[in-house]
C-alpha cells in the first residue's frame, strides 16, 4: 500500500522551516502533497497561484512531492487523495496545543487518517512566514530563512534591492 501524506498550510510564503518538514516527510512517505489551504479569514500577502509556484520551485528536486491547493476541510482533501496521514511541523510546545485541537477534530471527521508531528530543527524553531515578511518589509536579509525563489519574490513585492 502506498503511504500518502498531506502537508498543509497557508505557506505565505514557504520558509526553510516548512521545507525542512516537507523534505523529512518525503523520506518517510511514498508521496507528500503540499497543500496551500485557502483560508478566507486570512488576507494573504501572496496569491494562491503565487504560493503554488513558489512551492513548486522550492520542492522541484523532491520527486515524491506534489503541490496543490484546497479551499475546504483538510480531511476531505486527504480522502480525495487517498492519503492516510497528515504531516504537521511543531516549532515549540505552544504549537502543540493548537495542533492537538486540530488533530482531535480531524480524527472526529475521519478516524482512519493519522496525524504525524515532526519537530522542526532548532535553527527554524523561531521561524514563521509572518516574521519573514516583517524582516523583508524593512529590507532585512531573509537569505537564511527562505528558499532563493522566495527571497526574490519578497524583494520584488517590497521593491527592495537584493542584499
UniProtKB/Swiss-Prot annotation:
Disulfide bonds: none annotated. Keywords: ATP-binding, Coenzyme A biosynthesis, Cytoplasm, Magnesium, Nucleotide-binding, Nucleotidyltransferase, Transferase. The keyword Disulfide bond does not apply. One of its GO terms (cellular component) is cytoplasm. Its cofactor is Mg(2+). Its main location: cytoplasm. The record marks 18 as: Transition state stabilizer. Pathway: Cofactor biosynthesis; coenzyme A biosynthesis; CoA from (R)-pantothenate: step 4/5. One of its GO terms (biological process) is coenzyme A biosynthetic process. ATP binds at residues 10-11, 18, 89-91, 99, 124-130. It is found in: Cytoplasm. One of its GO terms (molecular function) is pantetheine-phosphate adenylyltransferase activity. The keyword Nucleotide-binding applies. It catalyses: (R)-4'-phosphopantetheine + ATP + H(+) = 3'-dephospho-CoA + diphosphate. Its EC number is 2.7.7.3. Gene3D superfamilies: HUPs. Belongs to the bacterial CoaD family. Homohexamer. Reversibly transfers an adenylyl group from ATP to 4'-phosphopantetheine, yielding dephospho-CoA (dPCoA) and pyrophosphate. HAMAP family: PPAT_bact. This is Phosphopantetheine adenylyltransferase. The gene is coaD.
